[in-house]
Curated annotation (Swiss-Prot):
NCBIfam families: PRK13668.1 (NF010189). Belongs to the UPF0354 family. It comes from Bacillus cereus (strain AH820). It comes from the Bacteria. Disulfide bonds: none annotated. InterPro entries: DUF1444. This is UPF0354 protein BCAH820_4810.
Length: 270
């Protein structure tokens, strides 16, 4: 059998077939590229050189090249994961619960409107952690949650401030993909609670904004409702159009409070 670059390409693709790797063949340059689907990092193999080795060593030449490529790609993946951070992200409760059939994401309940997912972030790539990835990382769900919350506390914050009709609104919008995640930083929420004189209202209309408001009158509630709806409609990754009253570590959706107010008002009038 005469070995050609095209035949060698087919042989290597058979040896290196893995669901997390992609192949790209440049027939003009006779180069086969094998790369990781997530990071796009990979190895280029010049096929004429492998064919020349095959003429001398036959199958052993293919085995050696396949081994080299496999080890290099696995090393790249380990290096990438060791540099990666696990961070929590806030999503709507309507967000998919599975990456695909039979492969659920790692999740934690948060509020009636929001759920916590976990992202493996290496700056260049960002992937929500599902059960299969969890196994590859060699971590438990509890370890992922603890690491994520620890890293969330290290995220910086600097608010812009605006006052309307006596109500003060604080906006966080760094566009780092984790603005809404700051809602999980309990020490941040407590420090804001101390400086707020009225009701503390918190909103995460989309991934790239956190709003904390000091609401002292009904106008303030109207403003935060309109503001949250506007941000929700404009967000690249919308979360919820509802805002929450924050008290003693709990988030109460405002529409529930409004319903309770109406019931109370009705009883008083009766």
């Amino acid at each position: 059998m005469k070995m050609t670059s095209k035949k060698m390409k087919d042989e290597l693709m058979k040896k290196l077939s893995r669901p997390e790797w992609d192949f790209h063949y440049d027939s003009e340059k006779e180069v086969l590229r094998i790369e990781q689907k997530d990071s796009k990092k990979g190895i280029n193999v010049s096929l004429p050189g492998v064919v020349a080795k095959w003429e001398v060593n036959k199958e052993k030449a293919i085995e050696e090249v396949a081994y080299y490529v496999q080890e290099a790609l696995i090393a790249m993946h380990k290096e990438e994961n060791s540099a990666a951070k696990i961070l929590p992200v806030i999503r709507s409760t309507s967000f998919p619960k599975q990456a695909e059939e039979g492969n659920p994401f790692i999740m934690t309940d948060h509020t009636a409107e929001t759920r916590i997912y976990y992202a493996l972030d290496s700056n260049k790539t960002y992937r929500l952690i599902d059960e299969r990835l969890l196994k590859k990382l060699g971590l438990t769900e509890q370890q992922v949650r603890e690491m994520a919350l620890f890293n969330a506390r290290s995220l910086g914050y600097e608010f812009k401030q605006d006052t309307v009709a006596g109500n003060t609104f604080y906006f966080l919008n760094t566009n780092d993909g984790y603005d809404a995640t700051r809602i999980l930083n309990e020490s941040l929420l407590q420090s804001m609670r101390e400086k707020i004189s009225g009701d503390m209202v918190v909103a995460v209309p989309h991934q790239d904004v956190l709003i904390i408001a000091d609401i002292v009158n009904e106008i303030g509630y109207d403003i935060i409702a309109q503001m949250t709806m506007k941000f929700f409609a404009e967000g690249h990754v919308p979360i919820t159009s509802l805002s929450f009253v924050y008290e003693d570590g709990d988030f109460e959706p405002i529409f529930i409070l409004a319903k309770n107010r109406k019931k109370t008002d009705g009883k008083e009038k009766g």
